Amino acid sequence: MPKIVVVGAVAGGATCASQIRRLDKESDIIIFEKDRDMSFANCALPYVIGEVVEDRRYALAYTPEKFYDRKQITVKTYHEVIAINDERQTVSVLNRKTNEQFEESYDKLILSPGASANSLGFESDITFTLRNLEDTDAIDQFIKANQVDKVLVVGAGYVSLEVLENLNERGLHPTLIHRSDKINKLMDADMNQPILDELDKREIPYRLNEEINAINGNEITFKSGKVEHYDMIIEGVGTHPNSKFIESSNIKLDRKGFIPVNDKFETNVPNIYAIGDIATSHYRHVDLPASVPLAWGAHRAASIVAEQIAGNDTIEFKGFLGNNIVKFFDYTFASVGVKPNELKQFDYKMVEVTQGAHANYYPGNSPLHLRVYYDTSNRQILRAAAVGKEGADKRIDVLSMAMMNQLTVDELTEFEVAYAPPYSHPKDLINMIGYKAK
């Protein structure tokens, strides 16, 4: 009976194991997870902190016991894989509760260890990061136990923005600082202005080009010379791949510690796959490498690897489009395609439209800003971005499908919109992009 070992039990690992079991009722499947929880919704965590998700149990899909009862898959939490011997096909495992170590053999090994939150490195009792349900519980318990009011949020990526919004919704008083003036880097810089407008509108303090120099109790000294007091600090300063345990193996890592994979999510070592945040692949629509550490990619990779292991070696990954979205108070920011800083590798043109998300005479209308970049050599779409209070998700998802099928910007005129006054225009913003590009 083949033995399949999975490292990591969150989106990629648990999903892959589940999909393998759906296709293969016989193999012995075991998952090692170094932390407390398995199969939780990472994307729900800011909303648990904000009490928008009222019961944290909604963010937890399975316990190891429930997973075994449903799928006959063994999950061992607090078990950390600390080394791989790919020649003997074994992994070394540390039981973090007992400190005991043991070896486990495998026929197939699936690596989905995810990434860990970066830390600013200050020794402080009031600093927290947010990466898993344990972090969420620690933040929530600290807020309740210490009657927290003033919270400093460090960083301005999508997680920090979601955390800040949810702290505000909970009734706390957050302040945002960021070390540069470049916020929400997946979005075009000039399209991020509504973020600052929303902060101003709600009188939420923020400072760009600001950093922490020192923390002394609740007293924070900043690079600017300011000294302020906060009850709590939440750091959202990026992540790094959990690949340290891989370094002693023959598995190839790139300079940042990620694992390059082929279109079957195979590593350079036979019988070893990598999925989720740790894996790097390529874009679907252009010839560039891509790392997209978001939920869709982990789930798609999990399905492909499961099919491969079950014997369907014809299924392959066609690449990322990098579709992403974030809500910040009343606005939605969404984009798809290459990142803004990757556009310089192409000879491109940009076309944009700003108009109501639906018919102007229908109540509740608000402006939607839609922008498309296309390659001048073949007129295929490289990137699209949308910002507005309504309809950004719909337009970006439609453009994602267009890019998936390599449509040109001119063909957007042929997009047949589902039109009624509450939803769109007879000529949608997507159509107008096509007309303006001609």
Swiss-Prot record:
Reduction of disulfides occurs by a thiol-disulfide exchange reaction, but involves only a single catalytic cysteine residue that forms a stable mixed disulfide with CoA during catalysis. Keywords: FAD, Flavoprotein, NADP, Oxidoreductase, Redox-active center. FAD binds at residues 8-33, 267-277, 419. Its EC number is 1.8.1.14. The keyword Aminoacyl-tRNA synthetase does not apply. Optimum pH is 7.0-8.0. SUPFAM superfamilies: FAD/NAD(P)-binding domain, FAD/NAD-linked reductases, dimerisation (C-terminal) domain. Homodimer. Substrate binds at residues 15, 19, 22, 39, 42, 71, 299, 427. InterPro entries: CoA_disulphide_reductase, CoA_disulphide_reductase_staph, FAD-bd_OxRdtase, FAD/NAD-bd_sf, FAD/NAD-binding_dom, FAD/NAD-linked_Rdtase_dimer_sf, Pyr_nucl-diS_OxRdtase_dimer. It holds the Pfam family Pyr_redox_dim. It is an enzyme of class 1 (oxidoreductase). This is Coenzyme A disulfide reductase. It catalyses: NADP(+) + 2 CoA = CoA-disulfide + NADPH + H(+). NADP(+) binds at residues 151-166. It comes from Staphylococcus aureus (strain NCTC 8325 / PS 47). Belongs to the class-III pyridine nucleotide-disulfide oxidoreductase family. One of its GO terms (molecular function) is NADP binding. Its cofactor is FAD. Contains 2 FAD binding domains and a single NADPH binding domain. Changing residue 419 to F: Reduces activity by 80%. Loss of activity. Catalyzes specifically the NADPH-dependent reduction of coenzyme A disulfide. Is also active with other disulfide substrates containing at least one 4'-phosphopantethienyl moiety such as 4,4'-diphosphopantethine, but is not able to reduce oxidized glutathione, cystine, pantethine, or H(2)O(2). The active site is at 43 (nucleophile), 43 (redox-active). Binds 1 FAD per subunit.
